[in-house]
Amino acid sequence: MRRYDFALTWVNSEQERFVQWLKRECKLRSMDMLVAGPDNIRSAVKDVEEGRLRIKFLLDNEAAYNEPIDIYARFCYAVKDTGGLVVCDPDYARAASNKSITHYDLIRSGIDVPYTIIVRNWQPDTFCLTPEEKKHLGGGFIIKPASGFGQKGIIKSATGSIAEIASARNFNRGDNFLLQEKMAPVTLDDKMAWFRVYYIFGEVIPCWWDTQTGRYAHVTLKEFSAHKLLPLVRIISEIARITRLEFFSSELALVKTVSGARKFVAVDYVNDQPELCVRPAAINGPLEDVTEHIAARCVEYAYRRIGNYPAQYFRQVTLAKLNLVDETI
């Protein structure tokens, strides 16, 4: 039987820096690593199911649990069923990736979310909003599939006509759809107060994220203190508790209420497969320092779990590295 200490599901190039960092970290710990992608995923599934291959730890980046038959989801279950540890656990990820489920979980836990109408997949194409619902949704609201990801199937400036809602649902007739109030974040130091926050094994990594440009910026200690961003940590930690996911990202926005007070709102609830492909600064994308840190953290966690060492699952907030020439504090 072949055995691998660490495996990754990945459909992009293995030359991506995230994959190279994982390989480096595995090599440092003398761990064998398998990348399961388009060329070998089917044979890998068969080998695991038939006892010829054993995976001790799997980091999943590809499973589509909303698809009736998805080979990567099957691989996750095969690894779990043969005693391997899967991050994220396929049963938890399946539930958490459905926004029509997570929406109510967050509300019950006291987390603020946008005003939302959920259209179930069995409702007719003649579904229409009441005047009161249209009023609460406001002009130019969002329509998105409950199990969607990667901005797919989203309408960003909906008006609420019967034809428009029916057309949006054609993206996936078997899915529920969320009609969601559009959030307008406040501005803090010339930055849009919209955050993409990573949660990884108890650790919280907050980043600014511009929804218009896709630009990331790691939150600094000075910003974290000056703008009172500690609620980001509380909210994403509560989402982790609710969903039981160990690694994910969430989008949180700071908005102004009708009364003038500010509050943090969970906008895109859970992404159990965060964006991890580093891109040149001109293109924008996840930050190199953050992504490299995540790679190291994943392998270290796997090493400790499969070696029965203390897993270092602790609460901490990781902020941007200090520039000792131009202090950020």
Model-derived regions: residue spans:
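Phosphate-binding site of ATP-dependent enzymes
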Residues: 155-240
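Extreme N-terminal starter segment of soluble prokaryotic enzymes
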Residues: 1-8
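Short, surface-exposed coil-to-beta transition loops
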Residues: 71-74, 190-194, 247-248
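C-terminal active-site "lid" helix and adjoining low-complexity regulatory extension at the edge
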Residues: 254-329
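Conserved N-proximal alpha/beta basic substrate-recognition cap immediately N-terminal to
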Residues: 10-124
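ATP-grasp fold ATP-binding core
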Residues: 106-107, 131-153, 174-188
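Hydrophobic residue at the +6 position relative to the catalytic HRD Asp in the kinase catalytic loop
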Residues: 250-252
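Short acidic/polar capping segments at secondary-structure boundaries
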Residues: 92-93, 120-124, 146-150, 160-162, ...
